[in-house]
């Protein structure tokens, strides 16, 4: 197992690679609270692309050439400003979401998460040429009504599927999708695919399906996981974990059992024990004071036999445990397994993201908040056993680690993860006012 303390020096890109396995490099000190990041790898150009939000909301980025092992811009230079987006202060919801278009252009989505008096919008930025961040990016506004938020997109064949949340009422928010068949130039009208229809008894009528989605090319489907939030106030309480699939053939929703759920999943279908859409039923827990019980970070992958494999957090103050978990679909039900577990406390150990290496070989990133540490664990038997690959301690300059997101799709070698920070004084502050560091992290291999 490899362990290394990272120094905040731009000179790291000049270090002798033969001295030790490359573990991390500082990409910039111009980041703010990243809710999440979505680094991507492009096999055509053999480059990985990294983007983050700056203090005023501007989007910055760098690309890594795996053949030359060089950064663009080099780490001795400032990162490239992809798009100017001045909001003072920035809002953590305005993080960049990234997808490679089928034609090789890099697409970056950004929401404008403002107060209702200012309105909301969802923007799309497109690289001027394939496989590169160089040049002046184009900018188009996709939607402004219904407060479009938490965008994430996935390429499926020659199409791109964009998922987002829309607001119906203050504590009634639904999940939608839109499709582009021309590399992001035009989009279908968004359609609701998950909706409680404002019928949840405790007013938990907000859908959260924030994490990155993955496409199953064999069965032509995209799995979505989500949890419920709401209560007396917006996002006050949080509970449950659900999963269903959007078919890219007929655009219907399907349960894990294969049951046809129609154009959208409603509350009765979520809670029907026969559909197995509910992966985990939980108590309602106060997300601000104790951390959401299933967090907002949960992903669904597909194993060789087509079964689903979900990774998620389960932080129960009532049960006194914080657990990093997996759930495997057996063909008739969900089998839950512990990745690791410890007593519940304020300084959380959190699951960050997942990377499918191949089939039953998967990796997860784990964040130890106040230890300033990110770890990688892996399983080669679909969650039966887990071993630690490496760990990294970061010099955060007093901030807390917030996100550790794998590059998608998997490519062996350096780098593997984009690591971001959040305010140490108030981790629920949505509008941090200081610059924070952001890094690329490896797994100790240098291929």
Question: Which residues does each predicted region cover?
Answer:
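Extracellular, repeat-based ectodomains that mediate carbohydrate processing or recognition
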Residues: 13-447
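Bacterial N-terminal signal peptides
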Residues: 1-7
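Signal peptide processing junction and immediate N-terminal pro/mature segment
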Residues: 8-12
């Amino acid at each position: 197992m490899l362990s290394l303390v990272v120094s905040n020096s731009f000179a790291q890109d000049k270090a002798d690679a033969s001295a030790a396995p490359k573990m991390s490099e500082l990409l910039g000190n111009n980041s703010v609270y990243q809710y999440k990041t979505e680094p991507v790898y492009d096999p055509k150009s053999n480059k990985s692309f990294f983007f983050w939000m700056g203090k005023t909301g501007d989007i910055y980025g760098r690309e890594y050439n795996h053949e030359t092992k060089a950064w663009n811009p080099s780490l001795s230079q400032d990162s490239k400003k992809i798009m100017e987006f001045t909001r003072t202060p920035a809002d953590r919801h305005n993080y960049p979401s990234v997808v490679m278009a089928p034609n090789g252009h890099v697409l970056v989505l950004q929401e404008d998460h403002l107060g209702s008096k200012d309105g909301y919008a969802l923007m799309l930025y497109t690289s001027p040429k394939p496989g590169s961040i160089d040049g002046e990016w184009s900018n188009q506004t996709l939607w402004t009504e219904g407060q479009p938020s938490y965008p994430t997109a996935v390429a499926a064949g020659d199409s791109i599927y964009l998922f987002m949340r829309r607001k119906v009422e203050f504590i009634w928010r639904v999940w939608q999708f839109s499709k582009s068949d021309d590399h992001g130039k035009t989009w279908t009208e968004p359609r609701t695919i998950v909706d409680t229809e404002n019928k949840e008894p405790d007013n938990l009528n907000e859908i959260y399906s924030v994490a990155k989605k993955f496409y199953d090319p064999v069965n032509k489907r995209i799995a979505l996981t989500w949890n419920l939030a709401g209560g007396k106030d917006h996002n006050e309480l949080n509970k449950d974990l659900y999963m269903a699939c959007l078919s890219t053939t007929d655009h219907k929703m399907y349960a894990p059992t294969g049951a046809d759920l129609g154009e959208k999943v409603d509350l009765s279908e979520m809670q029907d024990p026969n559909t197995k859409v509910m992966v985990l039923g939980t108590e309602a827990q106060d997300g601000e004071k104790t951390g959401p019980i299933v967090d907002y970070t949960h992903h669904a992958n597909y194993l060789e036999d087509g079964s689903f494999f979900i990774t998620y957090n389960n932080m129960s103050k009532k049960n006194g445990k914080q657990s990093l978990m997996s759930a495997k679909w057996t063909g008739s039900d969900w089998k839950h397994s512990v990745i690791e577990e410890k007593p519940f406390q304020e300084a959380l150990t959190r699951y960050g993201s997942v990377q499918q290496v191949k089939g039953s070989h998967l990796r997860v990133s784990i964040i130890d908040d106040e230890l300033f540490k990110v770890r990688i664990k892996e399983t080669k038997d679909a969650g039966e056993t887990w071993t630690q690959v490496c760990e990294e301690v970061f010099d955060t300059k007093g901030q807390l680690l917030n996100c550790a997101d794998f590059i998608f799709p998997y490519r062996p070698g350096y780098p593997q993860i984009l690591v971001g920070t959040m305010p140490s004084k108030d981790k629920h502050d949505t509008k941090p006012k200081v610059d924070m560091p952001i890094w690329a992290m490896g797994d100790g291999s240098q291929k």
